[in-house]
Amino acid sequence: VYKGILGPNDTAVAVKVLYLHQQGALKSFVAECEAMRNIRHRNLVKILTTCSSLDFQGNDFKALIYEYMPNGSLESWLHPISEAGDVDGDLRILSLLQRLNIAIDVASALDYLHHHCQDPIVHCDLKPSNILLDNDLIAHVGDFGLARFVPEATTRCNLNQSSSVGLKGTV
């Protein structure tokens, strides 16, 4: 992901370039575009536009352009990495109230995805590095490359079933 400047207002944006030589990259691009097409919520990262073109060598090039989140990911706040030789580091600590507000923001985004979209969406990759923080430390869930649509009929059939599968460090 790169930081860029867009338009006459010099708006900061995040540019997610997909490396199409990696297995599943095109599928991830399509999934993210489909998931983000019709969803709008204050706690979801806003996609501004997409780019699908050829690069200078004639290879396919795809990128997603997002609203820039100046405070980075929740991961960088929970597990800061200090630079070599940096005595104090850029020590950023979230208070209990800030952490609670971030949890509420993420829960609100998930509630929207699961219960208020035309077809419910399951994120499938929720982890601190995919939770981005704006200027006011409001959380925005991003990276919908693994998202799955759940047809309404399927959700009704599985009301009494639950599953918990995850990776260490994921939410």
Residue ranges and their predicted role:
Residues 1-171:
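Conserved eukaryotic protein kinase-like
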